[in-house]
Amino acid sequence: MRNMTLEHIAAVCGGTYIGNEADKKREIMGAVIDSRLVEKDYLFIPVRGEKVDGHSFISSVFEKGALAVLSEEQLENPAGPYILVKSSLDAMKKLAADYRRSLDIKVVGITGSVGKTSTKEMIASVLAQKYNVLKTEGNLNNEIGLPLTIFKIREEHQVSVLEMGISEFGEMDRLATMAYPDICVITNIGLCHLENLITRDGILKAKTESFAHLTPDGIAVLNGDDDKLCEKKIVNGKPAVFYGIGKEAKTAETEEGTKTLAEKVIYATDVEAVGLTGTKAVIHYPDKKTGEEVTMEVEIPIAGEHNVYNALAAVSVARELGLTCEEMKRGIESVQTIGGRSNLIHKNGVTIIDDCYNANPVSMKASIDVLSKAPGRKIAVLGDMGELGAEEKQLHRMVGAHFAGKGIDILYCAGTLSKEIAEAVQECSSETKVHYYGEKAALIQDLLKEAKSGDTILVKASHFMGFPEIVKELTK
């Protein structure tokens, strides 16, 4: 981490350096909060958690070769230098923001209600065809995970793709301060985190806090088919780059009446499902230099129209960063799925759609649509969606109403709120056999008896429901 000397770190964090004067000029090689990950000349940042206080590991990290540590308390006879700070977490965020600004690198920041991770994977896959890319791994998209990702950026990296997830006002302000993106992508404004953000307008306000932290030449890349995002036509004095499906601007029915959505710069036509294995589309975009329209046929190796939007976001970013049509196509067609997010598993003749990492009304309906196109018998295993606020029951019933008429043979539900899905399906559809369970164990037992070769089974719920256990049992 070039220029990250202990003296500089103390100044950035507003802390007090305590240790050998000669060590002040030494540079750290990395920064971590997990003592098990400490390597030679690393900075250890002890964070106080609900169960574990990182300060209790300070002595052990020096034994592993740590150059220094941050500390919220004075240390007696430390084995190495330390920087005394008021808050390790605040110091870490200040250090990440400073380090990001020291780097000669393009940063793509991604947020949105649905599809952040899959869009991040798509963008990273495309940009990797031309650049050395560092991306957010796993779910490290919050106020602890984002700085840890930034600390992993090295001189060889040319682009970093950073995911930013929030659940309250002010959180994006803090994240984007660290990320300082050159390009800000917002996938959509959907119904999630309503406990704190209350309405979609609240979500829009919270997500767009990121705009204040774009670089001076930074741009916003937005879903033009979203009735909230389409309002943000100018961001920091520059036109937003809108993408969507279909050339013409769409209309949407809103509380204010019929609304015409954004004119799209990048758009897709001829969207066609290829079973459960992929989605075909033709993507159109103007060449960045000549303005002439470029047409690109792609086959995305993941099912669902929502993945076309991910590809469009990737093309929008890639166009800004100078990739060729061939590079874009190669990156889109080689993207990989990750566990718990539309991951296809084949076991004993059964196809399992493992989409149980998280859920909200928008993603739940998209997964149901994918299942509806599957061959053979179709079985859905659905659980509760969390953080939906006062309208949680109504939103679960809305999913049930969407489910009805999709030609899905059997529905299994478990969880307090998913009972609303089951009841709505029973009220709207006589085709689907509906089974509701108060807990997972009985559901798993009956599902294992029911499943047979040729079935396709969708498993989806919010993460707290623990539905990976169901996938595990199905794949034994």
Where are these regions (language model features)?
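N-terminal leader/targeting and accessory segments in enzymes
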Residues: 1-94, 303, 373-376, 401-402, ...
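ATP-dependent carboxylate-amine ligase
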Residues: 1-17, 43, 182, 196, ...
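Phosphate-binding loop of NTP-binding sites
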Residues: 8-11, 91-224, 228-238, 318, ...
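Short gly/ser/thr-rich secondary-structure transition/capping motifs
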Residues: 22-31, 90-93, 141-144, 164-169, ...
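Extended acidic/charged loop-beta regions that coordinate divalent cations
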Residues: 22-25, 153-156, 166-194, 230-295, ...
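Mobile, glycine- and charge-enriched loop segments
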Residues: 37-46, 133, 144, 148-160, ...
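Short, polar loop motifs at secondary-structure junctions
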Residues: 69-76, 224-228, 245-248, 415-419, ...
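Conserved beta-strand scaffold positions in the cores of enzyme catalytic domains, especially
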Residues: 82-84, 107, 133-135, 240-242, ...
